[in-house]
């Protein structure tokens, strides 16, 4: 497999090295991240169906709604930092089903919640207890089932663990990649015991980290390197010019090739895909610049590839349920927007109740969102926006 990938990378280098401005007749997209693209405006509702789910609020169900997973029937949330141990299960109408808290020092408990993966078919929650280098598995009632220990050199605290198939989780080791502990950052781990099932190797010559550090502090772009794509997975390794697609049968192929080569840039500019639809590929470029005193940086450019027009644009997307032109972040919104690209859902995003109450009072909402906001107050749980693929 490693030999095949290396040969593929060489072929891609030869192809992209003599690239013109026109998209080639290949199975992968080529993106010049230094180009000045024409502007394009899109209306979210023109290409996705949007549903709003107000979360039930009562004494038991009060949450900041950090979104962890969504299934056909359930929404899984935790509070913002995951330190209080609360896990909230809502149904797809927003009605609270169960609140679970198994925090503690016992062998069947967790000390923190880095993230949660849902296997809805088996009725299992995988709690990323990363301080202890383990996943703890519970049923949907919070009953302990098993513990999956993983190597202490791994660190999945970025929360990028997902349900890959019936037997495995797919994980991204962000800290290990940042510290250059190993060549690969993408792994399949067994749902039964946490053992390594497969190391997903991507070819590159030198490790290039998107992180910057100064005086013991580190900063990174926090875009998503592991993205679902309707059963397959998009893998972003910052050290290589090729973004790959990884399938359920473990085959791997080029998905996007960026130019110019990452090794030729200073500072580096990285490319991250995000929401993927039948027509549009949303992407974002992020420059490796950060001011540690002002805590600002990583300037971004929002792009979209329109497959129908076979062209790339700089893009802004508006939510038509707001009277004013209100942009929707389709690319990066850490802790607020969660990319799904699976099971008919493109993404989910939380809308804070106090912001909706204010917008409602100013007459800035319309349609179903306006109706929901009329029944909210500033202490109400957030509203979950679910953007679904059109049937």
Located regions from the model:
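C-terminal motif of bacterial Sec signal peptides marking the signal peptidase cleavage site
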Residues: 15-17
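Blade/loop signatures of beta-propeller domains
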Residues: 22-54
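Beta-strand-rich domains and repeat architectures in extracellular enzymes and scaffolds
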Residues: 32, 50-85
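Blade-loop segments of beta-propeller domains
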Residues: 56-60, 90, 95-122, 129, ...
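Short coil/turn segments at the loop-to-beta-strand junctions that recur within blades
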Residues: 59-60, 101-109, 149-157, 203-208, ...
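Structural signature of eukaryotic scaffold interfaces centered on beta-propeller domains
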Residues: 65-70, 114-120, 160-166, 213-230, ...
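Asp-box/WD-like beta-propeller blade repeats and closely related beta-sheet repeat scaffolds
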Residues: 112-113, 130-183, 198-211
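Conserved blade-ending motifs and adjacent loop-strand segments that build the rim/top face
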Residues: 254-271, 308-341, 357
